Protein backbone atom coordinates (compact mmCIF):
# COMPACT_ATOMS: atom_id res chain seq x y z
CA UNK A 1 0.00 0.00 0.00
CA UNK A 2 3.05 2.29 0.11
CA UNK A 3 3.57 3.00 -3.60
CA UNK A 4 2.77 5.91 -5.88
CA UNK A 5 3.34 6.75 -9.53
CA UNK A 6 4.99 10.19 -9.77
CA UNK A 7 6.64 11.66 -12.88
CA UNK A 8 6.65 8.24 -14.58
CA UNK A 9 8.50 6.72 -11.61
CA UNK A 10 7.32 4.21 -9.04
CA UNK A 11 7.91 5.68 -5.57
CA UNK A 12 7.81 3.77 -2.27
CA UNK A 13 6.74 5.88 0.70
CA UNK A 14 8.33 5.19 4.07
CA UNK A 15 5.19 6.45 5.80
CA UNK A 16 1.58 6.85 4.72
CA UNK A 17 -0.69 9.71 5.72
CA UNK A 18 -4.34 8.74 6.23
CA UNK A 19 -6.67 11.16 4.49
CA UNK A 20 -10.41 11.15 5.02
CA UNK A 21 -13.44 13.19 4.14
CA UNK A 22 -15.78 14.83 6.59
CA UNK A 23 -19.31 16.06 6.01
CA UNK A 24 -20.36 19.68 6.48
CA UNK A 25 -23.89 19.23 7.87
CA UNK A 26 -24.95 22.75 6.91
CA UNK A 27 -23.87 22.71 3.25
CA UNK A 28 -24.15 18.97 2.59
CA UNK A 29 -20.63 19.00 1.10
CA UNK A 30 -17.58 16.92 1.93
CA UNK A 31 -14.03 18.12 2.55
CA UNK A 32 -10.68 16.35 2.94
CA UNK A 33 -8.57 16.24 6.09
CA UNK A 34 -5.54 14.14 7.05
CA UNK A 35 -3.51 12.98 10.03
CA UNK A 36 0.28 13.11 10.02
CA UNK A 37 2.98 11.63 12.26
CA UNK A 38 0.68 9.94 14.76
CA UNK A 39 1.77 6.60 16.16
CA UNK A 40 -0.86 5.47 18.65
CA UNK A 41 -4.63 5.27 18.88
CA UNK A 42 -4.99 7.97 21.56
CA UNK A 43 -3.08 10.59 19.59
CA UNK A 44 -4.98 9.68 16.40
CA UNK A 45 -8.31 9.91 18.23
CA UNK A 46 -7.41 13.25 19.87
CA UNK A 47 -6.15 14.82 16.62
CA UNK A 48 -9.08 13.47 14.60
CA UNK A 49 -11.58 15.04 17.02
CA UNK A 50 -9.65 18.33 17.00
CA UNK A 51 -9.62 18.48 13.19
CA UNK A 52 -13.33 17.66 12.92
CA UNK A 53 -14.17 20.41 15.41
CA UNK A 54 -11.84 23.02 13.87
CA UNK A 55 -13.02 22.46 10.29
CA UNK A 56 -16.69 21.64 10.94
CA UNK A 57 -17.98 24.71 9.08
CA UNK A 58 -15.47 24.87 6.24
CA UNK A 59 -16.60 25.25 2.65
CA UNK A 60 -13.12 24.51 1.24
CA UNK A 61 -12.57 21.04 -0.25
CA UNK A 62 -9.04 20.90 1.27
CA UNK A 63 -9.04 23.37 4.18
CA UNK A 64 -5.66 22.16 5.51
CA UNK A 65 -3.91 23.13 2.27
CA UNK A 66 -2.23 20.91 -0.30
CA UNK A 67 -2.93 17.22 0.33
CA UNK A 68 0.33 15.32 0.93
CA UNK A 69 1.36 12.97 -1.89
CA UNK A 70 1.92 9.94 0.40
CA UNK A 71 -1.70 9.33 1.33
CA UNK A 72 -3.95 6.35 1.80
CA UNK A 73 -7.60 7.30 1.30
CA UNK A 74 -9.94 6.27 4.11
CA UNK A 75 -13.59 6.51 3.24
CA UNK A 76 -16.70 5.74 5.24
CA UNK A 77 -20.32 5.29 4.30
CA UNK A 78 -21.82 5.14 7.82
CA UNK A 79 -25.38 5.40 6.50
CA UNK A 80 -25.43 1.96 4.87
CA UNK A 81 -24.21 -1.60 5.19
CA UNK A 82 -22.84 -2.95 1.91
CA UNK A 83 -21.38 -6.11 0.45
CA UNK A 84 -19.35 -4.35 -2.24
CA UNK A 85 -18.42 -0.77 -3.01
CA UNK A 86 -16.52 0.60 -5.97
CA UNK A 87 -15.28 4.14 -6.41
CA UNK A 88 -14.20 4.83 -9.99
CA UNK A 89 -11.04 6.91 -10.12
CA UNK A 90 -10.33 6.43 -13.79
CA UNK A 91 -10.14 10.18 -14.41
CA UNK A 92 -6.98 10.36 -12.29
CA UNK A 93 -4.20 9.16 -14.57
CA UNK A 94 -1.75 6.63 -13.10
CA UNK A 95 -3.52 6.63 -9.75
CA UNK A 96 -2.21 3.78 -7.59
CA UNK A 97 -3.32 5.32 -4.28
CA UNK A 98 -5.22 2.75 -2.23
CA UNK A 99 -8.70 3.49 -0.92
CA UNK A 100 -10.17 1.75 2.12
CA UNK A 101 -13.93 2.13 2.59
CA UNK A 102 -15.96 1.08 5.60
CA UNK A 103 -19.73 1.05 6.01
CA UNK A 104 -22.41 0.95 8.64
CA UNK A 105 -21.92 -1.81 11.17
CA UNK A 106 -24.70 -4.25 12.05
CA UNK A 107 -25.25 -6.63 14.91
CA UNK A 108 -25.91 -10.17 13.66
CA UNK A 109 -26.49 -12.55 16.53
CA UNK A 110 -23.63 -12.01 18.96
CA UNK A 111 -21.33 -10.54 16.29
CA UNK A 112 -20.81 -6.95 15.24
CA UNK A 113 -20.17 -6.85 11.48
CA UNK A 114 -18.72 -3.88 9.59
CA UNK A 115 -18.17 -3.98 5.84
CA UNK A 116 -14.70 -3.00 4.68
CA UNK A 117 -13.67 -2.67 1.04
CA UNK A 118 -10.18 -1.99 -0.28
CA UNK A 119 -9.38 -0.67 -3.76
CA UNK A 120 -5.80 -1.14 -4.87
CA UNK A 121 -3.90 -1.10 -8.14
CA UNK A 122 -2.61 -4.53 -9.08
CA UNK A 123 0.65 -3.00 -10.36
CA UNK A 124 1.63 -2.19 -6.76
CA UNK A 125 -0.41 -4.53 -4.55
CA UNK A 126 -1.19 -8.20 -4.92
CA UNK A 127 -3.87 -10.36 -3.32
CA UNK A 128 -1.30 -11.51 -0.78
CA UNK A 129 -0.82 -7.94 0.48
CA UNK A 130 -4.58 -7.38 0.66
CA UNK A 131 -4.93 -10.55 2.73
CA UNK A 132 -2.22 -9.29 5.12
CA UNK A 133 -4.11 -6.01 5.50
CA UNK A 134 -7.35 -7.82 6.37
CA UNK A 135 -5.54 -10.20 8.73
CA UNK A 136 -4.09 -7.26 10.69
CA UNK A 137 -7.39 -5.36 10.59
CA UNK A 138 -9.29 -8.37 11.98
CA UNK A 139 -6.70 -8.88 14.71
CA UNK A 140 -6.97 -5.23 15.75
CA UNK A 141 -10.77 -5.26 15.65
CA UNK A 142 -10.82 -8.33 17.91
CA UNK A 143 -8.84 -6.49 20.62
Residue ranges and their predicted role:
Residues 1-4, 35, 42, 54, ...:
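Active-site-proximal acidic secondary-structure segment that organizes catalysis
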Residues 1-18:
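Hydrophobic "lid/gating" helix adjacent to the active-site nucleophile
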Residues 16, 29-31, 114-116:
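Short amphipathic alpha-helical segments
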Residues 16-23, 87:
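Short amphipathic alpha-helices and their capping loops
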Residues 24-79:
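Helical lid/core segments from catalytic subdomains that handle acyl or acyl-like groups
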Residues 62, 69-76, 80-113:
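Flexible, Gly/Pro-enriched loop and linker segments at secondary-structure and domain junctions
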Residues 63-84, 123-142:
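Short flexible/disordered coil segments
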